Design a protein with these regions (language model features):
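Carboxylate/His-rich catalytic cores and anion/metal-binding grooves
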Residues: 157-159, 165, 220-230
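Active-site-proximal specificity loops/subdomain of glycosyltransferases
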Residues: 174-186, 191, 195, 223-286, ...
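Short, acidic, metal-binding catalytic loop of nucleotide-sugar glycosyltransferases
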Residues: 202-212
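Short beta-strand/loop segment that forms part of the nucleotide-sugar
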Residues: 211-220, 239-243
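Short, acidic/polar
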Residues: 195-203
């Protein structure tokens, strides 16, 4: 029988003859080798991990587990808490809380978190709220604006703060989702306010160009307040009492907050206003009562702001410089003329720190001049973007704020016709057109002719009493330091709470007040808040 070639033999693959064909590529041998190589691979990965990353892992773990050292027990005042069912920048069911907090509670106050508990009809959630501030952490002022933010439940009914098992319920309110106009101006808290002419200029010019005024008042001459109240009754302005910080119940000494916070914590008032309107308007501005903004080559603030943003995603805010002007004022309410105030204005050689106007979805808090949290923040516009852009303020070059720095009393017979000054930004165009000025004056006369307003004329201040006192105190406290370029934030806390304001019986004032509440003692922070705010005629013109 002829012998067949060896390569034609059928090779029986089985475990029984595995040894017989030891150098062949047997499937079981392939499987065994693969398992062996996988084991080697994972052992090698473990070896590399232990050699090169062990120390880094130990550092991360120790950092996470190490508690934040508590420096002292402190007190915090809660100004407001807002709830957002939906927010463009805060997300769904968001909570934002505005506080004045002692930064020396821990080494770095923004490292601290607050436990918040939200409850609705069916659930109860506990989450940590993160803290941010608009102030510099090396500021000399011990108390700062601190904003706490987290996201909780839909249809939330109650909100509590918790620390080591101790809980405190705090009131909250829903943010606005509708506003009278697409632009809102947040006016700094007024105290010992008596120059009512600035309100008339601010309101009627802002109205012409499409902004709603949100006012905050600490104290004010009573007749001036009554004038503003008539505008408020007509829905033309909104007014909020800005409260003096008080800790109604404490079990030991504490650092007095009003003397150790920057300028009555104006930043907290501006942040409160931003959070109140952030879902309701297209633009928010922060300014003082005597900061007048007039659009340049635009019919409205909205038109100018949209033009300046130009669709950019990296502009955090529009910054307008403040140019100082010296002008006149007259005593009679029926004799008021914004045309006369504008046409008799003369530019002073000085200027002041500018103010900002911004899209509210681009920031969740603000300082008195701009948002330090939003400026220079990284932003990614596409998933494929490897390096971020950085948000920054845009300095508006062709417009500036008409700052009513100084207003002198004059007799009506001494008012000159004058002429419209040039725009303080470009120094070429007119500050305002004759047609717009005539339109504003017509609206002013219409309002002042209303019986409920015209009857206030005899009661309004006809001389300056508080303004010179406040200016002198401010100058002695910090203006002269600032003007000589020696005002450093880590050396001087810009505060004038110690200013002495002598009261006059013939010049009664209203002052903000409320029912103050203190929560249970908590570690390391005990919380305080106020409810049912109102204006009292029994306190006087104080800060």
């Amino acid at each position: 029988m002829k012998e067949l070639p060896a390569y034609l033999y059928q090779i029986p693959y089985s475990l029984l003859n595995y040894e017989k064909f030891r150098y062949k590529m047997h499937p079981f041998r392939i499987l065994k080798a693969s398992v062996f190589l996988l084991i080697l691979y994972f052992l090698f990965r473990i070896f590399l991990y232990s050699v090169f990353f062990e120390k880094a892992v130990q550092v991360v773990v120790s950092t996470q587990e190490e508690p934040i050292p508590i420096l002292q027990e402190t007190h915090t005042f809660i100004h407001s808490v807002y709830y957002y069912p939906v927010s463009k920048s805060l997300g769904q069911n968001a909570i934002a809380m505005v506080t004045t907090m002692n930064k020396r509670t821990v080494p770095t106050i923004t490292d601290l978190t607050i436990n918040m508990i939200g409850t609705n009809r069916t659930a109860r959630w506990k989450k940590e709220a993160t803290l941010t501030t608009e102030h510099l952490l090396n500021d000399r002022c011990d108390y700062l604006l601190i904003t706490a933010q987290t996201n909780l439940l839909e249809n939330m009914r109650t909100l509590e703060i918790e620390a080591e098992g101790v809980m405190m319920e705090i009131p909250f309110k829903k943010a606005k989702y509708h506003a009278p106009k697409p632009v809102v101006f947040c006016v700094s808290p007024q105290f010992a306010a008596e120059q009512w002419q600035t309100f008339l200029v601010q309101y009627h010019i802002s109205k012409r160009y499409g902004a709603h005024l949100q006012l905050y008042i600490v104290s004010m001459v009573e007749s001036y307040y009554k004038l503003i109240s008539e505008y408020e009754k007509l829905g033309l302005v909104s007014v909020e009492p800005w409260l003096t910080i008080k800790f109604s119940e404490t079990d030991g000494p504490f650092l007095e907050p009003n003397r150790n916070v920057e300028l009555r914590n104006q930043a907290a008032a501006h942040t409160d206003c931003l959070l109140m309107y952030k879902e309701a308007v297209s633009f928010v501005g922060v300014l003082d009562m005597d900061d007048i903004l007039i659009p340049n080559n635009a019919e409205s603030y909205y038109e100018e702001f949209e033009r300046e943003y130009s669709g950019s995603w990296i502009i955090s805010a529009l910054s307008y410089g403040k140019l100082d002007f010296h002008t006149i004022k007259v005593a009679g309410l029926e004799d008021q003329s914004i045309s006369a105030i504008v046409k008799n204005a003369r530019r002073l050689p000085t200027k002041d720190t500018g103010k900002s106007f911004f899209r509210p979805e681009r920031m969740n808090s603000t300082w008195s001049h701009y948002s330090r949290n939003s400026d220079k923040q990284p932003i990614y516009l596409a998933p494929t973007q490897s390096e971020p852009f950085y948000m920054e303020r845009k300095i508006v070059k062709y417009n500036g704020m008409f700052h009513l720095k100084k207003m002198d009393w004059v007799n009506l017979t001494d008012v000159r016709d004058g002429s419209i000054p040039v725009n303080p930004g470009d120094n070429i165009t007119q500050l305002i057109s004759e047609a717009h000025l005539a339109e504003i004056d017509s609206d002013l006369r219409r309002m002042l002719s209303m019986e409920q307003i015209s009857q206030l004329s005899s009661t309004l201040p006809k001389d300056d009493y508080y303004m010179p006192i406040v200016f002198k105190c401010y100058n002695e406290s910090f203006y002269h330091i600032r003007d000589t370029a020696f005002l450093y934030n880590d050396i001087t806390c810009v505060n004038a709470f110690s200013c002495e304001l002598p009261q006059r019986d013939d010049l009664p004032c209203i002052h903000s007040d409320a029912t103050y509440h203190s929560g249970p003692k908590m570690w390391p922070i005990t919380y305080h808040y106020a409810s049912d705010a109102f204006f009292s005629s029994d306190i006087g013109c104080y800060q």
